[in-house]
Curated annotation (Swiss-Prot):
Domain of life: Bacteria
PANTHER family membership: LOW MOLECULAR WEIGHT PROTEIN TYROSINE PHOSPHATASE, LOW MOLECULAR WEIGHT PROTEIN-TYROSINE-PHOSPHATASE ETP-RELATED
Alphabetized GO MF terms: protein tyrosine phosphatase activity
Protein name: Probable low molecular weight protein-tyrosine-phosphatase EpsP
Species classification: Bacteria, Pseudomonadati, Pseudomonadota, Betaproteobacteria, Burkholderiales
The protein's annotated pathway: Glycan metabolism; exopolysaccharide biosynthesis
Family: Belongs to the low molecular weight phosphotyrosine protein phosphatase family.
Keywords: Hydrolase, Lipopolysaccharide biosynthesis, Plasmid, Protein phosphatase
Species annotation: Ralstonia nicotianae (strain ATCC BAA-1114 / GMI1000) (Ralstonia solanacearum)
Gene: epsP
Length: 145
């Protein structure tokens, strides 16, 4: 049973907050948290991320970035990352969690590019890829629950 999902990206201000919000919306009985490997701790979500999510009726303006910690990793039943490098880094730092770390795009074999400091269209493209990943994971998570 998956009770806690940890979503990870680099700064925890763009991709992981968007994925966290979409997963929370789709899985109301599951605790979904997010963090960054090199988080801009305490920073709000990127204004462009807030904007694209608002266009989809989801408010992430209250999000504050947090650093990935061993405690967060150990609490998570499932850890979803944005790319293969993040997956490898978490697996090397936390070998006991190797079987719990997957890319959000694992099912369709894709990574989600970082839109940080790019045009709004990059955020829209990232959100589209995140949604594809969420759509692939949600039925599997529900089936385990």
């Amino acid at each position: 049973m998956i009770k806690t999902i940890l979503v990870v990206c680099i700064g925890n201000i763009c991709r992981s907050p968007m994925a966290q919000a979409l997963l929370r919306q789709s899985l109301p009985g599951v605790s979904v948290i997010s963090a960054g490997i090199g988080a801009l701790s305490g920073y709000p979500a990127d204004p462009s991320a807030v904007e694209v999510m608002a266009h989809h009726g989801i408010d992430i303006s209250e999000h504050r970035a947090q650093q990935l910690t061993g405690s967060l990793v150990s609490r998570a039943d499932l850890i979803l990352v944005m790319d293969g490098a993040q997956k490898q880094e978490i697996q090397s730092r936390h070998p006991a969690k190797t079987g719990s770390v997957f890319r959000l795009g694992e099912m369709e074999q894709f990574d989600i590019a970082d839109p940080y400091r790019k045009q709004l269209t990059a955020f829209e493209e990232a959100l589209e890829m995140i949604q594809r990943g969420v759509d692939a994971w949600v039925p599997r998570i529900r089936a385990l629950g």
